[in-house]
């Protein structure tokens, strides 16, 4: 049985482990990021924005938790707003709360999302970007270049956990007991290679990235990426890994 290293946050690892198991793959869970809610922010008046951007399920979760707890009157405004999402899971989480979203980009990344929005829809308008502490600056950069204003609201922190099991993971790699390393964000990749204090892995270990943003981060580290799914979500990621390991 082939074994995949899963670097997702602990609370998000289990569904992916199940998806891998459907293909007869074993998993070793080694979370290299930890997600924590940010305190000290309030839900703004959503009617002042021409549109709202969410790029991860975490951004939806923490924003809606605060909104429903402290500003439930803003839910109808969110439901009536133009809302963009990156990824099927992010979009699906919004739709569960009655929020209609703009068509999803073909590729689940911010670059594809912004390329599908005409400049005339942005110029002179103000937008809200609900983000994590390590979210990339693609959306605010594009909005600014097109003459719009982007208000950024950080609702969760993305931090490096203690990684006590680093030595165990290094041993498993050395002993040939891991066949694939899977990364679902730039920070999972960066933190992993910082933890093992090396950019080198055994040549027969495949490197899998869930999308182009994560793949680019790995390439900047000097790590060759072997697997990218056709669509950037968990089920397709597991399918692509299984195909490569078969």
Curated annotation (Swiss-Prot):
Keywords: Lyase, Porphyrin biosynthesis. One of its GO terms (biological process) is uroporphyrinogen III biosynthetic process. GO terms for molecular function: uroporphyrinogen-III synthase activity. Pathway: Porphyrin-containing compound metabolism; protoporphyrin-IX biosynthesis; coproporphyrinogen-III from 5-aminolevulinate: step 3/4. Its EC number is 4.2.1.75. It is an enzyme of class 4 (lyase). This is Uroporphyrinogen-III synthase. It comes from Chlorobaculum tepidum (strain ATCC 49652 / DSM 12025 / NBRC 103806 / TLS).
């Amino acid at each position: 049985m082939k074994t995949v290293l899963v670097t997702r946050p602990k609370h998000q690892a289990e569904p992916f482990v199940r998806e891998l198991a459907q293909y007869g793959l074993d998993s070793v869970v080694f979370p290299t990021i930890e997600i924590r809610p940010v305190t000290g922010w309030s839900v703004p008046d959503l009617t002042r924005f021409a549109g709202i951007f969410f790029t991860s399920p975490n951004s939806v979760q923490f924003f809606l938790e605060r909104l429903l707890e402290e500003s439930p009157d803003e839910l109808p405004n969110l439901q009536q707003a133009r809302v963009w999402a990156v990824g099927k899971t992010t979009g699906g989480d919004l739709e569960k709360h009655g929020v209609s979203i703009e068509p999803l980009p073909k590729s689940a990344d911010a670059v594809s999302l912004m390329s599908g929005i005409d400049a005339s829809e942005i110029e002179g308008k103000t937008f809200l970007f609900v983000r994590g502490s390590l979210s990339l600056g693609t959306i605010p950069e594009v909005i600014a270049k097109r003459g719009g204003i982007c208000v950024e609201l950080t609702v969760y922190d993305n931090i490096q956990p203690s990684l006590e099991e680093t030595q165990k993971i290094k041993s498993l790699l050395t002993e040939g007991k891991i066949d694939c390393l899977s990364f679902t964000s730039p920070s999972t990749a960066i933190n992993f290679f910082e933890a093992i204090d090396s950019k080198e892995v055994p040549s027969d270990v495949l490197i899998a990235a869930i999308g182009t943003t994560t793949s680019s981060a790995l390439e900047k580290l000097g790590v060759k990426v072997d697997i990218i799914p056709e669509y950037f979500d968990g089920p397709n990621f597991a399918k692509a890994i299984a195909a490569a390991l078969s």
